[in-house]
Amino acid sequence: MGGHRMVLLGGAGSPGCKRFVHLGFFVVAVSSLLSASAVTNAPGEMKKELRLAGGENNCSGRVELKIHDKWGTVCSNGWSMNEVSVVCQQLGCPTSIKALGWANSSAGSGYIWMDKVSCTGNESALWDCKHDGWGKHNCTHEKDAGVTCSDGSNLEMRLVNSAGHRCLGRVEIKFQGKWGTVCDDNFSKDHASVICKQLGCGSAISFSGSAKLGAGSGPIWLDDLACNGNESALWDCKHRGWGKHNCDHAEDVGVICLEGADLSLRLVDGVSRCSGRLEVRFQGEWGTVCDDNWDLRDASVVCKQLGCPTAISAIGRVNASEGSGQIWLDNISCEGHEATLWECKHQEWGKHYCHHREDAGVTCSDGADLELRLVGGGSRCAGIVEVEIQKLTGKMCSRGWTLADADVVCRQLGCGSALQTQAKIYSKTGATNTWLFPGSCNGNETTFWQCKNWQWGGLSCDNFEEAKVTCSGHREPRLVGGEIPCSGRVEVKHGDVWGSVCDFDLSLEAASVVCRELQCGTVVSILGGAHFGEGSGQIWGEEFQCSGDESHLSLCSVAPPLDRTCTHSRDVSVVCSRYIDIRLAGGESSCEGRVELKTLGAWGPLCSSHWDMEDAHVLCQQLKCGVAQSIPEGAHFGKGAGQVWSHMFHCTGTEEHIGDCLMTALGAPTCSEGQVASVICSGNQSQTLLPCSSLSPVQTTSSTIPKESEVPCIASGQLRLVGGGGRCAGRVEVYHEGSWGTVCDDNWDMTDANVVCKQLDCGVAINATGSAYFGEGAGAIWLDEVICTGKESHIWQCHSHGWGRHNCRHKEDAGVICSEFMSLRLTNEAHKENCTGRLEVFYNGTWGSIGSSNMSPTTVGVVCRQLGCADNGTVKPIPSDKTPSRPMWVDRVQCPKGVDTLWQCPSSPWKQRQASPSSQESWIICDNKIRLQEGHTDCSGRVEIWHKGSWGTVCDDSWDLNDAKVVCKQLGCGQAVKALKEAAFGPGTGPIWLNEIKCRGNESSLWDCPAKPWSHSDCGHKEDASIQCLPKMTSESHHGTGHPTLTALLVCGAILLVLLIVFLLWTLKRRQIQRLTVSSRGEVLIHQVQYQEMDSKADDLDLLKSSGVIQRHTEKENDNL
C-alpha cells in the first residue's frame, strides 16, 4: 500500500489466525499490484528520462530529455565537464571523457528543454542542476549539447618499475589504446590511496613526483586530479579532461603501495624484544625514526604491532641509543588506533631534519608486569601512589600531578573518583631514585598507562615529593533496606568490605554529608535501633567527625574506636529528603526568592514554565516558611547563574517535601529567557493550608490553590490516573469529600479526555477509553454524563449529573491515554531477554530510541531498576548486526543519584531525530538478573542470579519466607507460599553467589537485603534455595474465557475485512485523483490528507500495541465474543 503501515491488532497466536493474516497480506499485495498498473505519476510529479542519441554507443551522443512524454535536447551554453560528469554517472557510464558542443554533436529536433545548466558534479540527475527553467532557452538545435562517456571497460592502469613489481612504480593509464602518464600537480595521499585500492595493492605507503620513480613517454593523460579517496577508480576523480595538462614527463607521478613497499619493524639494543631503538625496513633497507613529536600514542602503535600491547614509555634522545644509515620517518602523529606505524601521519619517506642522536625508541610491556596501588592511607582506595613496572618498584612524583591524573588512578583501582590530591614530603632515608612521572591525563582514561607522555626511570623528583590521593571509594556510603530511595540503614565500604555504623557514631553533620554524597538532598531524620533492619557482618567502630560541609564522607576525619560495645541492634539509619538540594536565593529574607536546584553537582535556577502554587506551597512548608503567598512571574528575584533546570514538579500541595512530589525532567523543553521560578512564603512557621469549601462540579477555579489569596487553602478536588503504568495514562479517578472515586464512560469522548490531560499537565489526549479499559475501580462513582467544551481547566468544571449522581457500574469506568504518557523498554530482535537490548521510550504515541551520549553508570542503573531487571548494568554501542530503530526521541540523559525513574533525569528536549556517529542509540545490558529454574510453573523453582557474566544459585542458610517474598515480588509473581531448602528443585551448577540473606520482606530486590559479600559461601549445591509463589496475576483471572481458537479466528477475520474495505476505498479514491489534471492543487491536498489519516490510524494502533495495555484490550474483546 504505497509504503504505508498497516497494524494488525489481536493477541491470538493460533495457526488459524496466522493463516488469515498471511492470506490478508497476500490479497492486499495482489490488489496493490493490479491497482498500480492503472496508476500514473501523482499530480505535481513529472516523469523524466535521459538518453544519449546519435552516438557510437549508449555512452556517447547528443543529450536528450523526455518531459511529459516529449523528447527534447539541452543547449550547450555553459556546458562543462561538471555537467558531463553528472550525465555519465546518471547513465551508468561513470567516466566522463569529453563535453561536446554544437560542432561535435549532431543536431536534434523538437523541444529544447534546458539551457545554461550549472552542475556542481555531485548531483544524482541532470535535472537536479540549476538551469533557466523548463523550456526556457535562447538556442537553436545547432547548439545542442553532447557528451562522450566511458563505462571504464576500455581503460587500464599499471605501475611501472624496473623490478617488475605490480604494486610500486610510475603511474600509467591506457586510454584509447595508448599508454600515458599522470602529472604530479596537486597529487596527494588520497590520489595514491585510490590507485593502490584500484590495483588491489593494499593501502598507499608513499607517492613521489618529479619522475623520481622514472620518467615515462607518450601522452600525459591526466592532470590536476581531485580525489577524496573514496573513488573506485582514478578516472572517477575530477580532472582537467583527458589529455589536457601543462606538464612534461619530468613531472610524472609514482606510487608505492603496501604490497610493494617491503616494510618491517624491529627494536634493537634493548633489554628485551619489547624495548629498544625503533628501526623500520623500507625498500629493503633498515633505518631509524626521528623523535620529533614522538609520544606515547606513537609508541602504543609500535608496541601493539610488535605484539607487546602496553606502551610504557616513548624514548627520545635522552635514553635511546644511536643508530646508523637512513632516517626513514619524521614527525609521526598517530591517533593510537592504527594497526601499523606507517598508517600514522608522517612526512614523506626519507624526508627529515634530524640526526641519529634524535633516534626514537620504546619500552613496551605485555601488561602482566605493570601494577599500580595506593599504600599507607587506611584502605586500598587512599594513600601514596606506588607503582611496580617490570619488577621494579617506585613512587609517583607529585611534579605535574593533577586531579585528572588522580581520577584515572582511582578509576583503574575500582575506587570511584578522586576527591583530594596531596603531596607527601618523602624522607631521604631509604630514598628511591625510581619515579613515575605524570603525563597528561584528560581524566577519561580507564588506566593510567593510557595517559600521554608519562615517564618512568631514574629521573630526579625535586624535593622528594610523593603523590597522594583519596578516592571516593575510601569510605563509600550507601542506604539499605529503605522503602523509598534515599532512606535506609547506613552502610560504609572500607576497601572491599561493607559494614554498618553504630547509632552513637553518626552525628547530624555526618548524616548531612551522607545525603549530599548520595545526591539525596538534605537529612530529614536519623534513626537508631536498626529501624530499617539489622545488618550483618562488620560494624565499624570509628566515629565520623564531619563539619557538615564536606562533599564526601571520605573527607571527614575519624576518631579511633572507643571502648564501648555495639551490636547490629543499634545500626543507625538515615532518611534524606530524597531529592536534590533546593534553596531560595536573591530575596530579602530566607523565605522568599528565586528557586534554585542543585542537580548533577551544580546549582542553577528552576524554569518557571511548570511552576505553580501547589509546588510553591510544598517548598515553603519544607523550608519551614509557612505557606506560599505568591509566585511572581519573570525573573522577579534575578536570573541567577548556572544552567536553568527544566524539571517539572507535579505536587498536589499536601506533600511534606518537594522530593515527595511526582517530578519529570526527561525531554523537558529548553527554558525561555527570563523564565525563572520564584516564591514569596508567608514566613509563619505554624501556618498550614486549611481545606477550602467543597467545589461543585460547575464551580470554576484556576488552581486547587489560588494564586493570590489572603487565606491560602487547598481544595478537596484532586485528579489522578490509575492502572496505566504512569501518571499520564489510566483510569480517571477524582478525590471528593475525603475519598477517591471514578468517572462513568457515558458520553466520554476526546474533548473530556483532553481536559483531564491538560489538568494533569500531561499534554493532549490520544485516546479516551471506556468499559473499564484500565480495570474496574472501587468506591464511589463521582461523575457521569460528563460533557466538556474543552476550555475547562478542571474536569469537575464540565457539565455533568452532579457529584455522585449516576446510573453506572464500575465496568463502565472511563480512562485516558495522554501524549505525555511514557513507557520504557529494552528491545532486541531475539525477544529472549527483556533486560538486554536497545533502550526505547514511548512518548506522544510513538516508540523511539534514547541516545547514549553522556550516559553514566548511574543512569544505566536507574533504567535497569525501573525495568525490574537489576541494580546496575552497562551501556554499549549498538551491535552492527542489529536493525535500525525508529527515530531517536531524546539524548544526553543524565540521572543524579537517588531518582526512582528515568523520567526524573535531565536530558535534551523531546525531538525526533536520527542516530548519528556523535549521537548513537543505547544498547543496555542489565546485571544481576534473577530467575527460577526446574519449577512446575513460572513462579516456582530454584532461585538463580545472574552476576558477573554467569548464572549462580543462592545458599539456603537463613533462607525464610521474607526472602521468598522479595523474590516473588521481584519476579512479578503472586504472594510467597513457601521458602524451600536443600535443593528442593534439584541442585544447580556454577557459582553460589549469595549466602546468609536476611530480608525484611519489603525490599524491592534480593540484592537490597543484607547478606554476606558476593560469592562468599561455605555451601554446596545440595543447599540451593528455592521458592514457591502464587501465579502471576493477569486479567484472565478476573474474566471468563471462551474458545480461544474460534475467538482468535473471528477477531482476525474482522480485522482482515476492515483492512480490505479500507484498501478498496483508498484505491477508488486514488484512481479518482489520477483522473484530475496535474495542476489541481486541491486534489493534491486531498491525496495528502488521505495518507495522513492512514498514518494516524496506524499510529493509533501502534500506540495500543506498544503501551503495555494491548493484551488486556484484546482479552476483553475475546471475552465479549
From Swiss-Prot:
<feature type="disulfide bond">
    <location>
        <begin position="620"/>
        <end position="681"/>
    </location>
</feature>
<feature type="disulfide bond">
    <location>
        <begin position="334"/>
        <end position="344"/>
    </location>
</feature>
<feature type="disulfide bond">
    <location>
        <begin position="968"/>
        <end position="1029"/>
    </location>
</feature>
<feature type="disulfide bond">
    <location>
        <begin position="441"/>
        <end position="451"/>
    </location>
</feature>
<keyword id="KW-1015">Disulfide bond</keyword>
<feature type="disulfide bond">
    <location>
        <begin position="75"/>
        <end position="139"/>
    </location>
</feature>
<feature type="disulfide bond">
    <location>
        <begin position="651"/>
        <end position="661"/>
    </location>
</feature>
<feature type="domain" description="SRCR 9">
    <location>
        <begin position="930"/>
        <end position="1030"/>
    </location>
</feature>
<feature type="disulfide bond">
    <location>
        <begin position="410"/>
        <end position="471"/>
    </location>
</feature>
<keyword id="KW-0812">Transmembrane</keyword>
<feature type="disulfide bond">
    <location>
        <begin position="744"/>
        <end position="808"/>
    </location>
</feature>
<comment type="subunit">
    <text>Interacts with CSNK2B.</text>
</comment>
<feature type="disulfide bond">
    <location>
        <begin position="88"/>
        <end position="149"/>
    </location>
</feature>
<dbReference type="GO" id="GO:0009897">
    <property type="term" value="C:external side of plasma membrane"/>
</dbReference>
<feature type="disulfide bond">
    <location>
        <begin position="502"/>
        <end position="566"/>
    </location>
</feature>
<keyword id="KW-0964">Secreted</keyword>
<feature type="disulfide bond">
    <location>
        <begin position="895"/>
        <end position="905"/>
    </location>
</feature>
<feature type="disulfide bond">
    <location>
        <begin position="955"/>
        <end position="1019"/>
    </location>
</feature>
<keyword id="KW-1003">Cell membrane</keyword>
<feature type="signal peptide">
    <location>
        <begin position="1"/>
        <end position="38"/>
    </location>
</feature>
<keyword id="KW-0395">Inflammatory response</keyword>
<dbReference type="InterPro" id="IPR001190">
    <property type="entry name" value="SRCR"/>
</dbReference>
<feature type="domain" description="SRCR 5">
    <location>
        <begin position="477"/>
        <end position="577"/>
    </location>
</feature>
<feature type="disulfide bond">
    <location>
        <begin position="119"/>
        <end position="129"/>
    </location>
</feature>
<feature type="disulfide bond">
    <location>
        <begin position="227"/>
        <end position="237"/>
    </location>
</feature>
<feature type="disulfide bond">
    <location>
        <begin position="546"/>
        <end position="556"/>
    </location>
</feature>
<comment type="function">
    <text>Involved in clearance and endocytosis of hemoglobin/haptoglobin complexes by macrophages and may thereby protect tissues from free hemoglobin-mediated oxidative damage. May play a role in the uptake and recycling of iron, via endocytosis of hemoglobin/haptoglobin and subsequent breakdown of heme. Binds hemoglobin/haptoglobin complexes in a calcium-dependent and pH-dependent manner. Induces a cascade of intracellular signals that involves tyrosine kinase-dependent calcium mobilization, inositol triphosphate production and secretion of IL6 and CSF1.</text>
</comment>
<feature type="domain" description="SRCR 2">
    <location>
        <begin position="157"/>
        <end position="258"/>
    </location>
</feature>
<feature type="disulfide bond">
    <location>
        <begin position="183"/>
        <end position="247"/>
    </location>
</feature>
<feature type="domain" description="SRCR 1">
    <location>
        <begin position="50"/>
        <end position="150"/>
    </location>
</feature>
<feature type="topological domain" description="Cytoplasmic">
    <location>
        <begin position="1067"/>
        <end position="1121"/>
    </location>
</feature>
<feature type="disulfide bond">
    <location>
        <begin position="515"/>
        <end position="576"/>
    </location>
</feature>
<feature type="disulfide bond">
    <location>
        <begin position="788"/>
        <end position="798"/>
    </location>
</feature>
<feature type="disulfide bond">
    <location>
        <begin position="607"/>
        <end position="671"/>
    </location>
</feature>
<dbReference type="Pfam" id="PF00530">
    <property type="entry name" value="SRCR"/>
</dbReference>
<feature type="disulfide bond">
    <location>
        <begin position="864"/>
        <end position="926"/>
    </location>
</feature>
<feature type="transmembrane region" description="Helical">
    <location>
        <begin position="1046"/>
        <end position="1066"/>
    </location>
</feature>
<feature type="domain" description="SRCR 8">
    <location>
        <begin position="824"/>
        <end position="927"/>
    </location>
</feature>
<dbReference type="GO" id="GO:0097110">
    <property type="term" value="F:scaffold protein binding"/>
</dbReference>
<comment type="function">
    <text>After shedding, the soluble form (sCD163) may play an anti-inflammatory role.</text>
</comment>
<dbReference type="GO" id="GO:0005044">
    <property type="term" value="F:scavenger receptor activity"/>
</dbReference>
<feature type="domain" description="SRCR 3">
    <location>
        <begin position="265"/>
        <end position="365"/>
    </location>
</feature>
